[in-house]
Amino acid sequence: MTQKSIHPKWFNDTKVYCDGKHVMTVGSTQAELHVDIWSGNHPFFTGSQRIIDTEGRVEKFMRKYNLQSNNDKQSKLEV
């Protein structure tokens, strides 16, 4: 016996948005998907390098290990 009503609703034409622009259509359990990165702007696929630090992880690492970034060193030299 199979159980009824246990599977999520499936949308064949889910629109995927990146930076407010429609970038592709896929199948999903949600009607719309909003993403920060997709294959059209990911550094691996575009060949460009971009630092993605949305939550301050670089600063947290620098503080944790008492390291200074180049900007901090330059500002201290100017003083």
UniProtKB/Swiss-Prot annotation:
UniProt main location, coarse: plastid
Protein name: Large ribosomal subunit protein bL31c
Function: Binds the 23S rRNA.
Membrane-traversing stretches: none
Subunit record text: Part of the 50S ribosomal subunit.
GO cellular component, one term: ribosome
NCBIfam families named among the record's database cross-references: L31, PRK00019.1, PRK00528.1
Species for this entry: Gracilaria tenuistipitata var. liui (Red alga)
Family: Belongs to the bacterial ribosomal protein bL31 family. Type A subfamily.
Keyword presence, S-adenosyl-L-methionine: no
One protein family per Pfam: Ribosomal_L31
Domain of life: Eukaryota
Matching InterPro entries: Ribosomal_bL28/bL31-like_sf, Ribosomal_bL31, Ribosomal_bL31_A, Ribosomal_bL31_sf
GO biological process, one term: translation
GO molecular function terms listed in the Swiss-Prot or TrEMBL record: rRNA binding; structural constituent of ribosome
Keyword entries, A-Z: Chloroplast, Plastid, Ribonucleoprotein, Ribosomal protein, RNA-binding, rRNA-binding
Gene: rpl31
Subcellular location: Plastid, Chloroplast
